[in-house]
Amino acid sequence: MQIGPYTIAPKVILAPMAGVTDKPFRLLCKRLGAGLAVSEMTISDPRFWGTRKSLHRMDHAGEPDPISVQIAGTEPQQLAEAARYNVDHGAQLIDINMGCPAKKVCNAWAGSALMRDEDLVARILSAVVRAVDVPVTLKIRTGWDCDHRNGPTIARIAQDCGIAALAVHGRTRDQHYTGTAEYATIAQIKAALQIPVIANGDIDSPQKAAQVLRDTGVDAVMIGRAAQGRPWIFGEVAHYLATGALLPPPSLAFVRDTLLGHLEALHAFYGQPQGVRIARKHLGWYAKDHPQSADFRAVVNRAETPEAQLALTRDYFDALIAGVPPPLHAAA
């Protein structure tokens, strides 16, 4: 798949997720097979660009090309300025968020709430495309609710405004993440456009990725929640699409080493105590399908230092590898 001058291969992409797709996670997913990793959204209001959170979100040093940064907001010129600012700070692709269903985002008329105002959508897209010399992409949902499934109209507006690629989550805003994603609307959008279209929503296995690509005709798939605690899913999907064969499940040693490396990257990126705190949700995701995961989380979430967090994690997985009960009572 081509987005401007950038070839995206393999055609499996890490979706932007607030509080998840930070630099350590993007680097990990790219290393494990993602063709593109989109940053968590950065707010367009310049009053917040100097905050600790924003500075972390705008740190792209050492990331492989292309660097894709998502921006969120409601005011066309403010979003245009945010796009320019992020390009000046390393962004090679600008992604506009019109897909986030979170109440606090939609109440501010950002995210998927923008889909209710098609004229405003056109003004925002035109302003951002004119503001920067890099490709601009867009992420949307299929509509606001089942009675207002205007994704195809928004998609046509996006293409007419110069958007370089479009990602579509197969739910409406009012569904949030309930029910199941539908891909018929995505197929309809793909059939009507000339720009690349990316399907998102409930793509949680190599077989599902292949099915969605086949059934919709889209150019790539985007994976979000299924990558939490499973960053190797990108390599699994890429291998299946290339060969038609499934990779064996990752070994416990591979999971342990991947998680320990992820923890170390979080500790280094955020410092103490923030790195330990942010790592806790990732620990829960990695451990959720393993024996005594609830007991492990109860113990490891009490760790206050990087050293303790790493030691508890290593001991837990070493015990699983050895086939003995994890020493959780001793660690507590």
From Swiss-Prot:
Reported cofactor(s): FMN
UniProt keyword list: Flavoprotein, FMN, NADP, Oxidoreductase, RNA-binding, tRNA processing, tRNA-binding
InterPro entries: Aldolase_TIM, DUS-like_FMN-bd, DUS_fam, DusB, DusB-like, tRNA-dHydroUridine_Synthase_C, tRNA_hU_synthase_CS
GO MF, one annotated term: flavin adenine dinucleotide binding
PROSITE patterns cross-referenced by the UniProt entry: UPF0034 (PS01136)
Pfam family, one: Dus
Recorded family membership: Belongs to the Dus family. DusB subfamily.
Top-rank lineage group of the source organism: Bacteria
Native species: Xanthomonas campestris pv. campestris (strain ATCC 33913 / DSM 3586 / NCPPB 528 / LMG 568 / P 25)
Keyword rRNA-binding: no
UniProt-listed CDD domains: DUS_like_FMN (cd02801)
Broadest EC class assigned to this enzyme: oxidoreductase
Catalytic residues (positions): 100
Primary role: Catalyzes the synthesis of 5,6-dihydrouridine (D), a modified base found in the D-loop of most tRNAs, via the reduction of the C5-C6 double bond in target uridines.
Catalytic activity: a 5,6-dihydrouridine in tRNA + NAD(+) = a uridine in tRNA + NADH + H(+); a 5,6-dihydrouridine in tRNA + NADP(+) = a uridine in tRNA + NADPH + H(+)
PANTHER family named among the record's database cross-references: TRNA-DIHYDROURIDINE(47) SYNTHASE [NAD(P)(+)]-LIKE (PTHR45846:SF1)
Residue sites binding FMN per the record: 16-18, 70, 139, 200-202, 224-225
EC numbers, comma separated: 1.3.1.-
Protein name: tRNA-dihydrouridine synthase B
